[in-house]
Structures are given as C-alpha cells and as structure tokens.
C-alpha cells in the first residue's frame, strides 16, 4: 500500500525508474556531499560558534531543505550549507569585519526572507537574467579561489609573511604533509570519478593522522546528538538591519541566487527535465526549497543553504524523482548520531575538501568572454578581489561598479540593464559609507 503510494506520488513509471535505483541514487548523492558535515562545523566554529550545535544545525537544515525539494518540488536535488558562503560568513564577515556571528546569522535570515519574497513574486528569475554573465561567473571563480586559499592556509601550506603578505609554509610539518597527501589523494579520486571522493579523502587522511599519532582517535562512533541550544534562535535580526550590513545581505542573496539557478539549470539539463523552451517546470518550487533552507538554517545556526551540484552523481546513476532527495534527507538525519567521528576529524584532513571544491568551481572561467574587455575586466576584478580581500561583498561591489563604467565609456551603455546601474550606485555608496 505504502509502496504503491510512493511509486504514484513520485511518478516512478513516468520516469522509468524504481525504488532500488532511486535509493542507490540517494545514497550516492549523499556520499558525494557528506563532507559538508565535517567541513561546515570546522569553518563556522572558527567564528566562535559551538562546533556540536553547528553540526546538528547543518544536518537538520540540510535534511529539511532537501525534504522540501523532494516532497514539494519532487526533484532529485540535495541541499546543504554552501561552500564559499560559509567561508565568507566566518572569514569575511565575522573575523574580517569583526561582526558577531549572531548578527551574521541575522543577515543570512534576511537574505533568505528576501529570497522567499522574490521567489513568490517570480522576480528572482528576472533579476538573475539581467545580471551580467561576467559578474555571475567571475563571482563563482572568485569564491573557488577564496575557499581554496583558506584550505591551503588551514593546512599550513600557505602562511603569512611580513615581507610578501603570504609565503610557502613548512612542508615538513607532519600535519602539512598529511594535508598535501589528502589533496593529492582526493585529486586522484576525483579525477577517476570515484563516488564520494572528497569524503573518502577526508576519512583516509584522518585515519593516517590518527595512526601516526598526529591527532587523537574518536572517543567513540555513535552518540546522541549534541545540544543545538548554543546556536538555536540566536540570530540577531535587528543588528543585521544596520545600513552598513546591506551589502553583506546582498552578497549572501546574490551568491545564493547565482549558485542555485546555475546549479538547477545544469542538473535539470543532465536529467532531461527542461521543456522545449529550455525552462525547468516547477522551478519556483525548487527555488522555494532553497529559500526555505536558508531561513531555517539561520534559525538553527548555520550559514546559507543552497542546492548542491553533487546531486549530479545520483542523477548519473539513474535517479530521476524526489525520492532521491528523501533518501538524502534521511541520511543527513542519521548522521546526527555520528558526532564523535565528526568531532575527531582534524583541520588538515578537511583542507583537501576546500582546495578540491575550489578547483571544481574554477570551471566557470570558461564562460567568461575574454575577447570582450568590457566583459573580461569586470569578471577579472571580481574573481581577483574576492580572495585578496577575503570578501565576496567587496568583489561583487567592485565588479558591479566596473561593469557599467566600462560599458558607458565604450559607448555601449544600452547593453547594461537599469538594475545594474542601480546596484552599482548602491555598492559605490557602500564604500563611501565605510570610508566615512
């Protein structure tokens, strides 16, 4: 009876699939993105948040958002806190600007609410279409460089230098050697298309470090989930409404939008969901899952939730319905009971995940039109300044300002949508406000 309902609700027959295929696809998708359970708490705890609470928030927010995607939008797409935005949350906003993590969570919440409003009014897709590709792809590449740099820094491969700002670290340090090993191992696994390559890299590197005595073994395998109280409903929304934080809210919003719509398009194309006009049916429902995840995540205690391109692994295995997402969500909830293992994973083991994910994000560079300097230069400024300033907001701001200036002074001002001019003024005023 239940199986009949499941098959009918998820339209197994229509998509030519079955319970076994959908379940295996869900397990595969989870394996490819489970690294976020280890990486996200490590990144956000650096901002002063409780490690255990963030781990719980990560699993629950991912499960809820993915369930909404599976049951409401009925697509095999999984969601979790976005890589890049979590790094920006910690290093760009909290540590870089000295903003309390509660206020930063408030900014994430506001961006999520904005996301919901614009999704309901269908304005979100319109905004995405009028933003220049140079800014979209420049941002993606810049975030890739940003998180890769953080990975190299946390591994001790790159260290600070008074003479040159940064320099090569001591590669003979045991933890640094292990991080290098992890990067090479994960690179090989990714290149060979091994399912769960990043997760395997983290686990193997950690085990070697534990065996060599560089880091301690976990105190156990299973336990009850830690308390979420230290981060649950701790966000400071009023503090985030400060005018000076407007560009941070916009940064969270735009990056989530670029990431989600770009990922949805790629996954929908791979799965054969696009209609004859190249549009994704029920796209608003899919976007709502993403927006809901961000709002719920901020309430629980984690940074922006977004759709994961790793969902492609489950689709490649034959997953075609929302049941895949249901399986992924259940596995995220099951992960709550593996806290001792998550807590024992050392930073040098997760460094490889940051570097490899950063490398994978570089693929967007091929979409930048380097033959047109009015497109190439704004994209270059965006992708360069994000890692160098440790701020996605600053990179976005400089990109939005540079783009219309070059178009105007080359007589091509009509190519720029009026919204881009408005955003350029807002971002320019941001610099005036900060300098004042």
Swiss-Prot record:
Keywords: Cell membrane, Membrane, Transmembrane, Transmembrane helix, Transport. It is found in: Cell membrane. It is a multi-pass membrane protein. One of its GO terms (molecular function) is purine nucleobase transmembrane transporter activity. GO terms for cellular component: plasma membrane. It comes from the Archaea. The chain crosses the membrane at residues 24-44, 51-71, 79-99, 103-123, 139-159, 171-191, 194-214, 235-255, 322-342, 345-365, 381-401, 416-436. Its main location: membrane. Pfam families: Xan_ur_permease. Belongs to the nucleobase:cation symporter-2 (NCS2) (TC 2.A.40) family. Azg-like subfamily. This is Putative permease MJ0326. It comes from Methanocaldococcus jannaschii (strain ATCC 43067 / DSM 2661 / JAL-1 / JCM 10045 / NBRC 100440).
């Amino acid at each position: 009876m239940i199986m009949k309902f499941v098959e009918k609700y998820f339209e197994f027959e229509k998509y030519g699939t079955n319970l076994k295929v959908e379940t295996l696809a869900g397990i595969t998708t989870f394996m490819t993105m489970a690294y976020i359970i280890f990486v996200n708490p490590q990144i956000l705890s650096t901002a002063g948040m409780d490690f255990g609470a963030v781990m719980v928030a990560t699993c629950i927010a991912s499960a809820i958002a993915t369930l909404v995607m599976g049951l409401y939008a009925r697509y095999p797409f999984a969601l979790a806190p976005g890589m890049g935005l979590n790094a920006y949350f910690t290093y760009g906003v909290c540590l870089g600007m000295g903003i309390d993590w509660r206020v930063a969570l408030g900014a994430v919440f506001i961006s999520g609410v904005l996301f919901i409003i614009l999704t309901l009014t269908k304005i979100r897709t319109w905004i995405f279409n009028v933003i220049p590709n140079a800014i979209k792809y420049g941002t993606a590449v810049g975030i890739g460089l940003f998180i890769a740099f953080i990975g190299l820094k946390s591994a001790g491969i790159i260290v600070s230098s008074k003479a040159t700002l940064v320099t090569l670290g001591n590669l003979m340090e045991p933890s640094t050697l292990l991080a290098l090993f992890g990067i090479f191992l994960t690179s090989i696994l990714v290149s060979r298309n091994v399912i769960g390559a990043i997760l395997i890299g983290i686990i193997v590197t950690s085990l070697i470090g534990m065996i060599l005595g560089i880091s301690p073994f976990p105190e156990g395998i299973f336990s009850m989930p830690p308390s979420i109280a230290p981060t649950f409903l701790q966000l400071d929304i009023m503090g985030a409404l400060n005018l000076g934080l407007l560009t941070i809210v916009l940064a969270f919003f735009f990056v989530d939008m670029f990431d989600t719509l770009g990922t949805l398009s790629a996954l929908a194309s791979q799965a054969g969901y696009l209609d004859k006009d190249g549009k994704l049916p029920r796209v608003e429902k899919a976007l709502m899952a993403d927006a809901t995840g961000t709002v719920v995540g901020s309430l629980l205690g984690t940074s922006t939730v977004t759709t994961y391109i790793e969902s492609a692994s489950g689709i490649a295995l034959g997953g075609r319905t929302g049941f895949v997402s249901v399986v992924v969500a259940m596995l995220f909830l099951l992960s709550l009971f593996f806290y001792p293992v998550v807590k024992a994973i050392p930073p040098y083991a997760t460094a490889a995940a940051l570097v490899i994910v950063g490398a994978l994000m570089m693929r967007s560079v091929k979409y930048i039109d380097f033959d047109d300097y009015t497109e190439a230069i704004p994209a270059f400024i965006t992708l360069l300044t994000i890692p160098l300033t440790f701020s996605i907001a600053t990179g976005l701001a400089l990109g939005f300002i540079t783009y219309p200036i070059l178009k105007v002074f080359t007589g091509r001002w009509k190519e720029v949508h009026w919204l881009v001019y408005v955003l350029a003024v807002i971002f320019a005023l941001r610099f005036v406000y900060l300098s004042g």
